[in-house]
Amino acid sequence: MSAIVDIIGREILDSRGNPTVECDVLLESGAMGRAAVPSGASTGTREAIELRDGDKNRYFGKGVLRAVENLNTEISEALMGLDAQEQTFVDRTLIELDGTDSKERLGANAMLAASMAVARAAADESGLSLYRYFGGSGPMSMPVPMMNVINGGAHANNTLDLQELMILPVGAASFREALRWGAEVFHVLKKLIHAQGMSTAVGDEGGFAPNLANHEAAIQLILKAITEAGYEPGTQIALGLDCASSEFYRDGKYTLAGEGGVSLSSQEFANLLATWCDKYPIISIEDGMAENDWDGWKLLTDQLGKKVQLVGDDLFVTNTRILREGIQKGVANSILIKINQIGTLTETFAAIEMAKRAGYTAVVSHRSGETEDSTIADIAVATNAMQIKTGSLSRSDRMAKYNQLLRIEEELAEVASYPGIEAFYNLR
């Protein structure tokens, strides 16, 4: 039987040493699922609310005992006896139980932990890998990894405003090969940074955080690493940026400390990004405008939307209501998918499906505060999202996802495909 007979929530620590929620779900058949939720550093204001204790005497207010208590009481009571195979009904029960748009009463962290653990228990009972449980038995695409090799912004303590500078192995023949290419570039980049006398310590997501003169210096350093690793920039390995622009948008201006403190209008910032795209093989820009600068987003989309993937993260926060508005207004051409921004798997899958129907791409993503949980790897494959963003080529919390993707590709064998540049179908 698939009936839920026990739910156990607990407080664990994430990759930054901050508390997060883990949940075990036990079924009548003896099957069990365990899941842990991530947490972000730069968060959109419209994200579902993760419940924190606020007790400054314990983890500086970041404890999650209230969320855990909600899991072990209200959520447990509501889900007890439900069929774990009925994911949509389970998630709808959670949403109705919380009763708020932002999931602030029970906490999106508590709700997501339950949603994920139920799915894992159901997959375990079915004898299926999680990606097969979600995605069925047909052919599947492995995702192109967006590898964050230089960190800035809220993810690092350096002079760069942009949060992530990424490499995308679009010319590889398989995910395994793409991962190898990325790892080789990462190690060459480390040597180049060290040779310049800069620190090779890594940031929250495993990328380097050197103090460079400006953003173009960072881009040029990455291109040099790609070339010295033996690869062709652009055709084999392209570049991506996560600007996280909301972090440096104030009073209608984008103020870039890493560019000499210049303050730019939306049009001027769009022009700067367009200039970089003309000079360098940049094919993806995330949060190129601030989450509330919809006019700026429209300018950027009109200017670059036919040749560059424009990903809405803080803009859309994995929310179908906001995504629908963006599609209607012709804003962006891609959505970043973060499961903890919305709080249930059902709503996550709905956002991916809505994006695809509109010709937008969907990039499944980690958060800067992660755990060893690798659910997003299975989601990326199961939904044929074809892109994943899960950090650099270091830190075991990031490698957990990459290694799971290696296992999935091995298991799929000849029915796995690697789309490469075709993953960017929004640019055709």
Curated annotation (Swiss-Prot):
Task: Please give the chief subcellular localization of this protein.
Answer: cytoplasm
Tell me the SMART domains matching this sequence.
Enolase_C, Enolase_N
Where is this protein found?
Cytoplasm; Secreted; Cell surface
- What positions does UniProt annotate as the active site of this protein? 205, 338
Entry keywords, A to Z: Cytoplasm, Glycolysis, Lyase, Magnesium, Metal-binding, Secreted
Pathway listed: Carbohydrate degradation; glycolysis; pyruvate from D-glyceraldehyde 3-phosphate: step 4/5
* EC nos: 4.2.1.11
Q: Name one GO molecular function term.
A: phosphopyruvate hydratase activity
Q: Please, which domain of life does this record's source organism belong to?
A: Bacteria
Top class in the EC scheme: lyase
Q: Which reaction does it catalyse?
A: (2R)-2-phosphoglycerate = phosphoenolpyruvate + H2O
**What's this chain's function?**
Catalyzes the reversible conversion of 2-phosphoglycerate (2-PG) into phosphoenolpyruvate (PEP). It is essential for the degradation of carbohydrates via glycolysis.
Q: Which family does it belong to?
A: Belongs to the enolase family.
Record protein name field: Enolase
